[in-house]
Amino acid sequence: MRILVTNDDGIFAEGIYVLAKSLQDVGEVIVVAPNTERSAVGHGITMHHPLRMAGVRFFDTSIEAYSVNGTPADCIKIAIEVLLKDRKPTVVVSGINNGPNLGTDVLYSGTVSAAVEAAILDLPSIAVSMATSKIDQYNHAAEFICKLLSNTLHIEELSDTIINVNYPTIAYSEIKGVKVTNLGIRKYENAFIERLDPRGNAYYWISGKAMELAQDHESDVQAINDNYISITPIHFDLTHFKSFKKLKNLNLEK
């Protein structure tokens, strides 16, 4: 198995190091990741300046690794269509993200968008996230991804599926199990912090916190709240089928 690993926290983030190192027990690992943090860039791609890819020494390992001056989606595109054109990966794994990607977070997430890009290019993919920067907790999450890949014998059959994994940030002994979930609702109380530059012009920092909302008991948000590992199969087809027939029945004219 050939595993392409990426993230949105940057190639020298602890999460990707732990993940890539653990995945060596499952197959051949190649890392292609942004040269700096690109969190919450969504599915953006670089069109107005050149992309550059450079080989890097990946921490204390001998893993083949490259940094890219672009987004997570850029990393997947250039890896699959240029670098690995003649040695196609079996699967793409994105993470371990420092922060959860639950519910509507997936629309903002560079971590998830990298996995979505892989699915667009007909490769199965996994995105893995957790709200921690503790090495021991990353290790448990990485071990779980290795088990998931080992148990998914025919991963190629999931080429149009993104498996979005969220791992709870609690002691390993407190994790109750694993749940297959749907995307929940994740909204934020946004706060815009206004400041002035030296010329007196206003600029803003956006911040905020997740709102406590009622959740479907089958949702990823609820699973994490209940101390379960959440696995959500997602897809890049955003068609809202509930409204499809209603719109078709409208008397629309050009």
Curated annotation (Swiss-Prot):
Q: What is its main location?
A: cytoplasm
Q: Give the binding site residues for a divalent metal cation.
A: D8, D9, S39, N97
Q: Give the first-level EC class, as a single word.
A: hydrolase
Q: Which reaction does it catalyse?
A: a ribonucleoside 5'-phosphate + H2O = a ribonucleoside + phosphate
What GO terms are given for molecular function? 3'-nucleotidase activity; 5'-nucleotidase activity; exopolyphosphatase activity; metal ion binding; nucleotide binding
Hey, which family's this protein in? Belongs to the SurE nucleotidase family.
Name-wise, this protein is 5'-nucleotidase SurE
